[in-house]
From Swiss-Prot:
<dbReference type="InterPro" id="IPR002222">
    <property type="entry name" value="Ribosomal_uS19"/>
</dbReference>
<dbReference type="GO" id="GO:0003735">
    <property type="term" value="F:structural constituent of ribosome"/>
</dbReference>
<dbReference type="GO" id="GO:0015935">
    <property type="term" value="C:small ribosomal subunit"/>
</dbReference>
<keyword id="KW-0687">Ribonucleoprotein</keyword>
<dbReference type="Pfam" id="PF00203">
    <property type="entry name" value="Ribosomal_S19"/>
</dbReference>
<dbReference type="InterPro" id="IPR020934">
    <property type="entry name" value="Ribosomal_uS19_CS"/>
</dbReference>
<protein>
    <recommendedName>
        <fullName>Small ribosomal subunit protein uS19</fullName>
    </recommendedName>
</protein>
<keyword id="KW-0694">RNA-binding</keyword>
<dbReference type="GO" id="GO:0000028">
    <property type="term" value="P:ribosomal small subunit assembly"/>
</dbReference>
<dbReference type="GO" id="GO:0006412">
    <property type="term" value="P:translation"/>
</dbReference>
<dbReference type="GO" id="GO:0005737">
    <property type="term" value="C:cytoplasm"/>
</dbReference>
<dbReference type="InterPro" id="IPR005732">
    <property type="entry name" value="Ribosomal_uS19_bac-type"/>
</dbReference>
<keyword id="KW-0699">rRNA-binding</keyword>
<dbReference type="GO" id="GO:0019843">
    <property type="term" value="F:rRNA binding"/>
</dbReference>
<comment type="function">
    <text>Protein S19 forms a complex with S13 that binds strongly to the 16S ribosomal RNA.</text>
</comment>
<dbReference type="InterPro" id="IPR023575">
    <property type="entry name" value="Ribosomal_uS19_SF"/>
</dbReference>
<keyword id="KW-0689">Ribosomal protein</keyword>
Amino acid sequence: MPRSLKKGPFVDQHLFVKVAKENEKGTKNVIKTWSRRSMIIPDMLGHTIAVHDGRKHVPVFITESMVGHKLGEFAPTRTFRGHVKDDKKGKRR
């Protein structure tokens, strides 16, 4: 179920303050955050936010098409290395 419209988007307060300071200064420094649950709002457009994926921070450049999504959607937590392929050349008898 999506969040109620009357509540508005959820953004962690510390992240919102960092974005507001960057907008006020007019700079575009990388903002590091652990808040994967925060929603992307129009104030974040053009910023690069480093989202934690469990072991490192993944830089995410915010574009218009990302508004309304959550930051965690753009920093995958699991690495899929593929299924093991049968090696028929190495099985010579």
